[in-house]
């Protein structure tokens, strides 16, 4: 098992949910958490625990962001006019690694981060190797010519387990995508329920 595969499986086990909807997730085979005592009946979870879990799940989904990274994004979502939870989702979906993942250029969020880091991606014709780079509406994201024949890339575009959402226009024949608009929570194809409102409650109290 690769380090990246281990990381995403660890997050699924920790959450007890298949948060990316992957067919090989370990939680598809059992309905209890990791560890020796995973099968014990869980007690009632406190409001704090519910809010913390919502935050950890959202952080994990976008590649297990650090608390510092996530808190910075949240602070920006809070400053922007409008609903903080919706703003948070919009900012997360505008990350370059998230757009590369949504466009189905790669199979996982973790692969997207590595793909960007290794300079396989251009934004509006310029190489960008920062996964957290903030994409704007109308930006064109494309795979570099020398990277377009990578086997993993071609396989990812053919994955049937998820579709490209309508706020991204992807042309896999050109390995190119356009970020059409910033999505609302209801537009984002999360395989599990994400509750940014609980994240807002968490940070309001902690």
From Swiss-Prot:
Signal sequence extent: none
Q: Name one GO molecular function term.
A: rRNA binding
Q: Can you give the residue ranges of the S4 RNA-binding domain? A: 94-154
Alphabetically sorted, this entry's keywords are: Ribonucleoprotein, Ribosomal protein, RNA-binding, rRNA-binding
Q: What single Pfam family name could you report for this chain, choosing any that match?
A: Ribosomal_S4
SMART domains cross-referenced by the UniProt entry? Ribosomal_S4, S4
Would you tell me the Gene Ontology cellular component terms?
A: small ribosomal subunit
Disordered, as annotated region: 18-46
Q: Give GO terms for biological process.
A: ribosomal small subunit biogenesis; translation
Family classification: Belongs to the universal ribosomal protein uS4 family.
Quaternary structure note? Part of the 30S ribosomal subunit. Contacts protein S5. The interaction surface between S4 and S5 is involved in control of translational fidelity.
The record's function comment reads: One of the primary rRNA binding proteins, it binds directly to 16S rRNA where it nucleates assembly of the body of the 30S subunit.
* HAMAP family xrefs: Ribosomal_uS4_B
Protein's UniProt name: Small ribosomal subunit protein uS4
The scientific name of the source species is Roseobacter denitrificans (strain ATCC 33942 / OCh 114)
- As recorded in Swiss-Prot or TrEMBL, the protein's gene is named rpsD
